[in-house]
Amino acid sequence: QQVAGGSFHSLALRSDGSVAAWGSDTAGQVSGTPPESGFVSVACGHSLSLAIDGSGAIASWGDNSDGQVSNTPTGTGFVQVSGGDSHSVALQSDGSLVSWGRNHHGQVSDTPAGNDFVQISAGGNHSLALRSDGTIAAWGSDTEGQVADTPSGGGFAQVAGGDYHSVALRSDGSI
C-alpha cells in the first residue's frame, strides 16, 4: 500500500493496515511497531516511525530524546504526517498544521497558522507546507537556503524536504 524510509530504517503499510518495519533499531523505531492493523499511512523520521490510523489518530514510536514520541498530538482528524531529523509535522483535516519535537531552529515554534494547507514535508531541521492556492510555506533551519530560497508565487503541486534542501513540483510538471 505504501512505503516510507528513515535514515536507517523503513516501513511498509500492508493491505490489511498493519505495518512492517526493518533496518536499524537504535531507538525502537523498528521493534516498537504496533501489532494492530487499521493504519492508512506511514512515515519515517531519522530514528522515528509514524503511522495514521483510520480515525486519523497518529501513532509514533522510536527516538523520544526531544519529545518526538511523548509530544505526539492526540485526537483524530490527521490526514498526513511527516518526520524530520528530530521533529515531525502533521496536517489536520481542517487544513491546519501541528508540529512537535526538537525546536532548536524554529521547526516547531514557527509552524505557520491557517487552515489552507493541503500537503506537508518535514526536512532535516525544517518543514514545508503547500497551501491550497499553490504557494509554499517554509520554516525552521536555513543553513543552506532551504527556507529562504523557497520560491514565491503559486502554481506548485507538491513539496519535499531533504536534510539540507527543499524541492517543489510545479503544477505544469517542472521542478
Report the location of each language-model feature.
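Short loop/turn segments that connect beta-strands within the blades of beta-propeller domains
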Residues: 6-8, 15, 26, 45-46, ...
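Tandem repeat domain/solenoid detector
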Residues: 1-2, 15-20, 37-41, 54-59, ...
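Conserved core positions of repeat-based scaffolds
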Residues: 9-12, 21, 48-51, 60, ...
